[in-house]
């Protein structure tokens, strides 16, 4: 066993998008801090290094990535995988150029400030951490290409992750897409756009979800969307009524108006994409799969046969799980979490802003985590916490908020920005009181 000892101000576990956003913001506000990044992969970018080839951002590139480097062409642009991977290469170069950041790719964090190369686990390095350990893995993203199914699959079943679909879509007669989250939607859209007829696609949907309409999450429109959602929470006392009102006024959509969704995961699609998805009528709603064999797809109460020449596409990873929140700041530790609904990278950058502000951890923890939602009744408390956090962050970091490209309001003209800030202040208390009508699950 080899022991080495190094000293660093911040030891960051994980090199994904949230860690990158945190480090980028920290570098802008602390020109002397030293940072070590510990990452199992060889590159920054986290799950983007394992993403399926045809993936695109689900929300505008204008407010994704890190504060210091623009991504995409602005506006409604949705960057594709090659551009995103090149972007994180640029981020890496920025970190290297600073002279403040050391990247330990291909390393495992062992706990107790110790790391070791995955290829040489006996070669241990121990860090003296002067300020904080930063946990960039708390959100525990499940990556579709490497996440095994939660059910038994017989060895003779043609079963593959979504990543392989690009080489297999023209070799099979029938397709079974397993999973109805955003990954499952992307799989169905890929097949349809590559000439596979809708009747050849069988979509196993354990549940239906409400989705965000991407048209309402564009630069200049998001705050209006937040206010519409706030109004719906104030006016209704049941979660399904909130979403039905939002569906009527615009901003929330679902694949089948005859089915009441039981899930809400922040999946973002356009009305045009939703119209394409509606072309797939072979929707199997039998709950979760228990077992997949040549005898059929086994559910709790029924087994369904399938054709011999059928390919099964695994889209069952819970990419954005509803994690139990924990205080962001604790003694000598930071757990990176969202502080705005469905906006992880902004949250990480804002946490760096708080870390470098002149206040106590008790004050910093006035900013509460906003966990990813799972069911519709999670939404009122999520939106309430988002509004409260926005107001508190403006008190802590007013100029930083206005200048942060990751904060969606920063793209608005100053008079619109200020007007929306006033509206948020006026409505926040009413939303907070109204949210108490809804049960909380997270």
What are these regions (language model features)?
Residues 11-13, 126-142, 176-178, 307-318:
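Short hydrophobic core segments
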Residues 70, 74-144, 266, 273-300:
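Feature captures the FAD/FMN-dependent oxidoreductase FAD-binding
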Residues 40-90, 162, 204-262:
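Glycine-rich active-site loop/strand segments that organize a redox cofactor
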Residues 386-442:
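C-terminal active-site-capping segments
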Residues 2-55, 412-413, 421-422, 426-429, ...:
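N-terminal low-complexity, Ser/Thr- and acidic-residue-enriched intrinsically disordered segments
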Residues 293, 298, 303-358:
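Extended alpha-helical coiled-coil/bundle linker/stalk regions that scaffold oligomerization
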Residues 19-28, 164-212, 346-399:
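Rossmann-like dinucleotide/flavin-binding elements
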Residues 74, 80-87, 135-195, 201, ...:
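Glycine-rich dinucleotide-binding loop and its adjacent helix/turn
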């Amino acid at each position: 066993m080899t022991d080495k000892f190094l000293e660093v101000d911040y030891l960051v576990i994980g090199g994904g998008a949230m860690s990158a956003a945190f480090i980028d913001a920290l570098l802008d506000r602390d020109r002397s801090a030293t940072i070590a990044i510990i990452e199992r992969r060889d590159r920054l970018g986290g799950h983007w290094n394992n993403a399926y080839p045809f993936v695109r951002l689900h929300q505008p590139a204008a407010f994704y990535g890190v504060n210091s480097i623009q991504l995409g062409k602005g506006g409604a642009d949705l960057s594709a995988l090659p551009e995103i991977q090149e972007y994180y290469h640029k981020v890496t170069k920025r970190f290297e150029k600073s002279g403040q950041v050391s990247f330990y790719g291909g390393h495992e964090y062992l706990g107790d400030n110790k790391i070791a190369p995955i290829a040489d686990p006996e070669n241990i390095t121990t860090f003296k951490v002067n300020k904080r350990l930063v946990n960039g893995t708390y959100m525990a993203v499940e990556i579709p290409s490497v996440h095994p199914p939660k059910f038994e699959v017989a060895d003779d079943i043609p079963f593959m992750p979504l990543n392989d679909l690009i080489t297999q879509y023209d070799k099979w007669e029938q397709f079974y897409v397993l999973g109805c989250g955003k990954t499952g939607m992307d799989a169905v859209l890929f097949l349809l756009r590559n000439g596979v007829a809708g009747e050849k696609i069988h979509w196993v949907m354990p549940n239906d979800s409400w989705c965000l309409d991407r048209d309402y999450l564009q630069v200049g429109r998001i705050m209006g969307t937040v206010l519409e959602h706030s109004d719906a929470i104030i006016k209704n006392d049941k979660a399904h009524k909130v979403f039905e009102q939002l569906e009527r006024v615009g901003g929330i959509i679902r694949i089948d108006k005859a089915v009441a969704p039981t899930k809400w995961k922040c999946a973002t699609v356009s009305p045009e994409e939703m119209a394409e998805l509606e072309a797939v009528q072979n929707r199997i709603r039998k709950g979760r799969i228990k077992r997949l064999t040549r005898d059929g797809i086994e559910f709790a109460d029924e087994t369904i046969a399938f054709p011999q020449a059928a390919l099964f596409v695994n889209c069952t990873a819970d990419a954005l799980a509803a994690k139990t929140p924990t205080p962001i700041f604790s003694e000598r530790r930071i757990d990176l979490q969202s502080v705005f609904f469905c906006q992880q990278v902004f949250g990480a950058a804002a946490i760096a802003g708080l870390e470098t502000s002149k206040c106590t951890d008790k004050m910093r923890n006035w900013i509460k985590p906003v966990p990813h939602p799972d069911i519709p009744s999670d939404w009122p408390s999520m939106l309430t916490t988002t509004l409260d956090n926005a107001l508190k962050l403006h008190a802590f970091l007013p100029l930083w908020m206005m200048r942060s490209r990751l904060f969606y309001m920063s793209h608005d003209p100053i008079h619109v920005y200020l007007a929306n800030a006033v509206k948020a202040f006026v409505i926040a208390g009413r939303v907070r009181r109204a949210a108490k009508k809804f049960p909380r699950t997270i």
